[in-house]
Amino acid sequence: MVAHAEINNLSFVYADENEYALQHISLSIQKGEFIVLAGGSGSGKTTLLKHFKKELLPIGKRTGDTYYDGTLLENVPDLLSAQEIGMVFQNPENQLVMDTVIQELAFSLENIGLPSHIIQKRIAELISFLGFQDLLHQSVHTLSGGQKQLVNLAAVLVMQPKLLLLDEPTAQLDPIAAKEFLGLLKRINEELGITIVLSEHRLDEVIPLATRVICMSNGRIVYDGSPKTVVANMWEVEKFRPFIPQIPRLFLEWNAKDIPFTVREAQMKLNNFSAISYVNKPIAQSEKQEVILSAEHISFQYEKNSPLILRDLTVSIEKGEWVALVGKNGTGKSTLLTLLAGLQKARRGKVKWNGKVIHKIDSKERFKSIGYVSQHPYYHFTFDTVWDEVYERARELYGEQGKEIAEHQLKKFWLYGLKERHPHDCSGGEQQLLALCTTLLSKPTLLLLDEPTKGLDPWKKERVGELFRKLQKEGTTIVMATHDIEFAAKYVDQCMMLFDGAVIMNDAPKEFFSGNFFYTTSINRFIRKELPYALTWEDVYEACPNDILHS
């Protein structure tokens, strides 16, 4: 049987670079598979995905061949490629080109010359399948991140593709929107028979959906097989262990023979064994510190007659505290960060830093002492190479020492090997690290971070978490907006949930997540009855004996 898509001994190096992004890749994909590409940042996942669609082939030197339904990729007709091979990217903003949802859906169909009655029929049928009729005539700019990504997916599906490629499609979605999006992908795969190849760092939700997992490292395929086989292989190599989702990781630590991947599977296994006993230890309360940053009764809207994004919101952040802002896409987390940074001014209320109204502080002092990283890191970039981005800022701050400091900083953030690359050619995770790397050069005492772990692989995420903890011990105050529940649960001091323009929950992670049904970790959902405050596999492993499954 001819493979749906096939790659034979593909190697690729980007233009003006020496290190190969892909090395000797051979891969065969059958119709109807649901494949998850796993691996570290810069391991070649995005580059590999782009080699399945000729319009997206990156510029550089390649050897080897790619086939689609038995035809060399470069010989696949343009119209066929446009219709049958679809791709959804990480950033929901990047693919939207029209003003309204219905225009976005019609755009691609009009481009391939379909008559209006066929366009109307396809859109009607798809909207009925996806179930978002209420969004059809809305402006795409008013949609939440989850809704925008749903529209991106719909704009690809309306072409009736046979192969669907997705590059970290849930990276900017809140946990509930991400779960809904992935559930829709599974439905598309099972009900429509569309082949799916998806790259992802957060494997907890996607591995249970996959029929096959491919793990990459340094441009090579290191493991390829069923989810259980690949996870078992990853367990044998220390550097891949952080990539294993929380529930299977816990059971592997317990030396279980049959590894569960979902909360339901894990609970069924636990029901077969003696109940876990636990001591409900009191949670230590940290000493109160001085309030260094506050927002007092602030309200904000982008236009005079537009809806309020924030309404009468009051928060206070203590010196040296690490706070996570969580909540659904569109609840105002990013807006609040820009107000705290002094980049925008509240319509009502005041933001104070060190007791001073933020807008009365000299802008140079603000820029040096307050580090802000947007959820769109490429907004920060003004130079043509990674090196220039870091060196020019280091030279501005430290003069002749700038070169040495820039080299050290690039190595610290795993970017030195990319120093000649254009920032826009870096992966999403690499862009995130570059923006963070540059921002930290000024040694800010306040860090305001919008989705700082987005696009980072689990290993780098742990290193960044440790770096933030070190900065915190040195007196840095950190406020971050995040959808990464596991990261927040493991590292932060305080969690605040935004809803309807206000903070509705504010607590330490263990109290915050243990009281939630949806906004909590997979480990807590699995074992909250036995261990109410357990949020990570480490929490459970510490509380339970190693041989629990054999008791």
From Swiss-Prot:
Please tell me where ATP 2 binds in this chain: G327, K328, N329, G330, T331, G332, K333, S334
Cell membrane as a keyword of this entry, yes or no, is yes
Q: One Pfam family, short name please?
A: ABC_tran
**What EC class is this?**
translocase
Q: Report the locations given in the UniProt record.
A: Cell membrane
Main localization, broad class: membrane
Name used for this protein in its record? Putative ABC transporter ATP-binding protein BT9727_3105
